[in-house]
Amino acid sequence: MDFNLTIAVVALPLFMFLFLGLAGVKMGRKLTGVLGVIGQGVTTVLAYGLALTYFFGTGQGQIVDGVRQTIIVADWSWLNLGDKVMANIGFELDPIAAMMLIVITTISFFVHLYSLGYMSDHDGNAEKGFQRYYAFLALFTFSMLGMVVATNIFQIFVFFEMVGVSSYLLIGFYYSSPAAIHASKKAFIVTRLADFFFLFGVIVLGFAVSTLTNLVPEGGSALSFSTLLSNPEAIASQLGAVEFFGIPALPLSLICIFIGGAGKSAMYPLHI
């Protein structure tokens, strides 16, 4: 199986979001749901195929010196944020990404399937806004998949934001219900606070690593995982001497990124 299908695994839910969001109103509600399930089913099958090929295939993804190799499927230039701080858009497979593709697509498939009945009334008729619901589910799936195959930490932040937006849209799906409106607003506000810390942590980390000119290769980016993981011991050691306005940069960035993740996952005390 071609590892370029990683792109298809991520792009198919995006296509389903656009297709169901734009054309769903022209189709029957049940047909929209069935197409959503089929689309997610295809995505899930592709994800399993990719993971099996990565872990058990020959060639790429082999274990070298006890470490299974990371595969950069694609990496396109996007934003130049400063000297040695570039934000690209790309796709990479490593053991964690391959496993998370399976986890995300499997759970999403069963959510799509379960929703066919859950989002119907006692007579089996799909609820109003059924097409919109399945479009939002596809967007949510796309956002999570894009995050786990990211090649750099800034791309993770971008998809991290998209997860927050799609969560807000799903929580507030019943927009005529005061309780749903209140819950969606509360979730949106709390996650925006978390997003601020995450972004600030990314900025501090990018600034700090970019100062290590001997460890960031020419044409490389301080935000890319290939740079951050190329020599983690040396990077961590040298970052200990880097400060951000008088504050040690490494612990500051890691604490901020942790708060971002904690807020997004509603960990205490951001569980309100």
Describe each PLM feature range.
Residues 1-272:
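...captures the hydrophobic TM-helix bundle architecture rather than a specific catalytic motif
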